[in-house]
Amino acid sequence: MIEPDILRKAQLIMLDMLIEFDAICKKHQLRYWLDSGTLLGAVRHAGFIPWDDDIDLSMPVEDYNIFMEIAASELSSDIFFQTSKTDKAFKFDYIKLRSNKSSIVEFHEKDRQINYHQGVFVDIFPMLTIENTEANKNMYDSTLEKIRRASSVSLHTPDGKDDPETRKALAESLQQHHQGWDDGSRKIIYGGQMPDVAAWFDLAEVLPLKDIEFEKHFFPAPNNPDHYLKAIYQFDYKQMPPEDKRVTHADSISFT
């Protein structure tokens, strides 16, 4: 169990990374929003879920690709921009901002030889849009299931199959359905880099974005957070879970 003061110190480092990322996005007019547990924390706690040990963000794929190009030149020396290209041992398909002032060992990494950068982190995922049809919903669900079967590393099942080339091809097949952001009747979907979440969202309930309070700062969020969170979570997210479910991903956190 991570001691509360250690976890809080890690959360404040992540908050600093989010503030820096937000400033870069404002400078370059890039869109992003709080996602998953970070959005839930903003709605329910006006900050981190008390036991959360990461930050989740999403970006329209066009903005995500621009950020990929400028990140190395824009980020401060406190942050490592982690991709499978900047860190050859990193086998995940999305990007992370990693703190150079800390280290986190997640439970799935415990007792394994890890060679990639392990600073506390911010996850960033690319988002797409598709036409709102039953055929597209079936295609999306089927594609994510195929990606899951090729994602033992990213889904923390080391005895399973890991096939980066298959994942890449499947994610690219999703991008071929991308329709842009100008029609509120479309659905927003994850780009396949987070295949354990198969939610899709009404574009009109996400854009335009609105600011939401998080740790006494304000950051972009879907304009209807309730719609977004209900699409992700199959439980009443407004209620605190039982104490035995209030667990971190981390086995240990340390600082340099």
Please describe what each predicted stretch is.
Residues 48-49, 63, 148, 252-256:
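Short amphipathic alpha-helical patches
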Residues 45-46, 135-138:
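Short aromatic-enriched loop/helix-cap "lid" or pocket-rim segments at secondary-structure transitions
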Residues 22-55, 59, 64, 232:
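Active-site nucleotide-donor binding segment shared across nucleotidyl transfer reactions
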Residues 137-151:
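Short, surface-exposed, charged loop/turn segments at secondary-structure junctions
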Residues 2-26, 71-132, 151-232, 238-256:
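Conserved catalytic core of two-metal-ion nucleotidyltransferases
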